[in-house]
Regions:
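Beta-rich carbohydrate-recognition and catalytic domains
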Residues: 1-210
Length: 210
């Protein structure tokens, strides 16, 4: 669903009717987080910034089975009990994430939130999408939690080490002793920890195979 389709979906009368119907459902969850409509999956980019807790998650608003390219949904809270539904934060609207804004994480640095996520691309052709046909790009987003200041690919698919499947996704970022690190899980072959500098974006690959 591209940006125009996303905006149209949010404004559709049937979307409002569906929200109202779901809100009255006897099986709707209230203690645990649940989207207003559609499909919800992995929590992403959990962080606290300027007194607000931000909870992002995999989200397909128009399909409860999740059989569409996922976005990042967004909820906020000041007490971790009451949550407010926010506008969709990230959508698959670029060439590097056109088949899904996959999972990632966030870290606060220099009064900004830095998000890292996997942009999923499935190329046309006779592929199994495990060993061929899939691109997984690591994307960096700078934001205040609501609007996007900058968004760019920092590790394109072709920059990953050779010898792994095309399933290279869901970067986890963290800080230790003044240095910032990223862990990217891989299918079958274990993990490749990548240390990085948010300022100059120089990457160092350390291969760890099981």
């Amino acid at each position: 669903m591209d940006l125009c389709a996303k905006e149209a979906w949010q404004e559709l009368e049937q979307q409002s009717e569906l929200k109202a119907k779901i809100a009255q459902d006897n099986w709707r969850l209230y203690f645990h987080l649940m989207p207003e409509t559609g499909w919800m999956n992995d929590p992403n980019g959990l962080c606290q910034f300027n007194g607000v807790y931000h909870f992002y998650h995999q989200y397909v608003p128009q399909n409860p089975a999740g059989k569409e390219a996922p976005h990042w949904g967004h909820k906020t809270s000041t007490n971790l009990v009451d949550f407010k539904e926010e506008a969709i934060f990230l959508s698959p609207e670029h060439s590097y994430d056109r088949n899904g804004v996959f999972s990632g994480s966030a870290i606060v640095k220099d009064d900004q939130i830095h998000f890292f996520y996997t942009g999923n691309v499935k190329n046309e052709g006779d592929h199994d999408y495990t060993f061929s046909g899939r691109e997984q790009n690591t994307v960096h987003v700078i934001s205040d939690g609501y609007s996007i200041e900058k968004q760019e690919v920092v590790i394109p698919h072709e920059a990953y080490p050779a010898g792994f499947t095309d399933h290279i996704r869901d970067p986890k970022v963290f800080e230790k002793e003044g240095r910032y690190y990223m862990i990217i899980p891989l299918v079958i072959c274990g993990n490749v920890p990548i240390s990085f500098n948010l300022t100059d974006k120089i990457f160092y690959f350390f291969h760890h195979r099981e």
